[in-house]
């Protein structure tokens, strides 16, 4: 057979020495899963996936974490190293916060969440903490993991305020903004009914102001698709749902990803209905810091 006649891949990604992925997908999380699959046979009984790698295995959001390298924790060593495809960490003795997920060695859910929360900002930390609780992590275990060390203060704030009712990372980011901007805390996943029965459940609800807040994302709507439905069908159903709620004298504010990432956008949209009052939610200064947390001087 003439191999020269075969189509050549448009792109090739190195997973590890001697192993490549042709035409890698655009989704960096999917690419990282391929990296993990390539690295798995190389791990011995003293090695565990950690940080962003463990986060993907557990189902935690990873945000802007380093997905270009596989993150591996080796027990019984003292020095780590970084290569083009791996970031290796060492610990002198085997810590208690290691586990198996579907036969794969990883840091525990609480340890993984803590590792990720410490190295990002308060908003993403809250999203990670929310997801950890939703996946079954106990709050006390998470609080124990984030205690002390780099990034502990904002991570502790996030662990204290985490809520398993938050259904998506963007809902968590909205709630983080609510806390940071001194807005009243809403009820989460509140349900509404009318004379015809159940209408639906909303992301946020402020009873005092009869105000509903919802994050709109394409992933959210595609997840609502029934067999044979189009996205337009879902959008129409959502419009009917909103009209029924508005008939209950409810007001709506909606946000997309651009609003979440635009400073002041969420606060401005809510204050149109609730006024200018500011509530001190008691966040530590680090939870108001929009810079990535850095190591403290010794």
Regions found by a protein language model. Give the residues of each.
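Short gly/ser-rich loop at a beta-strand->alpha-helix junction or flexible surface loop bordering the NTP-binding
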Residues: 1-151, 275-298
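Surface segments flanking catalytic/ligand-binding clefts of nucleic-acid enzymes
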Residues: 133-298
């Amino acid at each position: 057979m003439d191999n020269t006649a075969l189509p050549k891949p448009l792109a090739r990604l190195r997973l590890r020495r001697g192993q490549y992925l042709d035409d890698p997908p655009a989704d960096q999380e999917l690419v990282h899963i391929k990296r993990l699959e390539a690295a798995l046979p190389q791990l011995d009984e003293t090695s565990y996936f950690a940080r962003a790698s463990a986060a993907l295995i557990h189902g935690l959001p990873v945000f802007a974490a380093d997905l270009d390298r596989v993150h591996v924790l080796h027990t019984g060593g003292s020095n780590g190293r970084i290569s083009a495809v791996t970031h290796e960490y060492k610990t002198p003795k085997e810590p208690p916060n290691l586990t198996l997920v579907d036969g794969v060695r990883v840091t525990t859910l609480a340890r993984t969440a803590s590792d990720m929360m410490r190295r990002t900002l308060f908003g993403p930390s809250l999203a990670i903490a929310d997801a950890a609780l939703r996946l079954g992590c106990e709050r006390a275990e998470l609080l124990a993991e984030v205690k002390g060390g780099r990034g502990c203060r904002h991570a502790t704030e996030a662990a204290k305020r985490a809520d398993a009712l938050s259904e998506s990372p963007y809902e968590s980011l909205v709630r983080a903004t609510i806390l940071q901007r001194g807005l009243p805390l809403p009820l989460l996943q509140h349900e509404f009914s009318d004379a015809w029965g159940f209408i639906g459940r909303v992301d946020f609800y402020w009873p005092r102001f009869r105000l509903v807040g919802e994050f709109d994302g394409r992933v959210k709507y595609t997840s609502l698709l029934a067999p044979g439905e189009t996205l337009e069908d879902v959008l129409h159903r959502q419009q009917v749902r909103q009209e029924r709620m508005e008939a209950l004298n409810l007001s709506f504010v909606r946000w997309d990803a651009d609003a979440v990432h635009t400073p002041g956008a969420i606060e401005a949209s809510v204050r149109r209905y609730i006024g200018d009052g500011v509530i001190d939610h008691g966040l530590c200064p680090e939870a108001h810091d929009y810079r990535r947390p850095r190591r403290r001087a010794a």
